[in-house]
Amino acid sequence: MDKYFYLIAQLPTLYFEREPLITESQFLEEARKWLSPATHELLTRVDLSETTVRSGDPALIRQYKRFEGELRSELAEWRSARRRNQDFKLTRLPTALVKEGDPLTVEKNLLYWRWQYLEEAEPGHHFDFGFLLIYCLKLQILRRLFTFNKPTGMQKYQQYTETSL
């Protein structure tokens, strides 16, 4: 327990849409100093985009993977229905999250939805391994958020919409 306390106490607070003061690699390197090799290995396996539950996954990661898998399935069904001009009612997230705005705004909205899911899971984890798992996932969300290049994305979006007209 002490090792988690000292590691977590020195981590900077993360805020959505604010560039983090620590990178994921810096976080994992610092965690290596405090965690056992087996525990550190579990932490390095955390992957925001992974939805397959593996044996040995901590309970919090299994829950997140189920959440992510259900979110993606519902989005795929919704997008498929839209292509066929059919109605589809989203049940896991507000429709406005994916309907309003350009593709970049929608992607940011979905990242924020994931962030909120992690925020809701966090109160039960103050100075434990679960907090570190959540922190790692949040760093991955921020990394993805700050890799978006708005001018390049807008150019590609306009190319795709022009060719489909």
Q: Which residues does each predicted region cover?
A:
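Extended alpha-helical surfaces
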Residues: 1-165
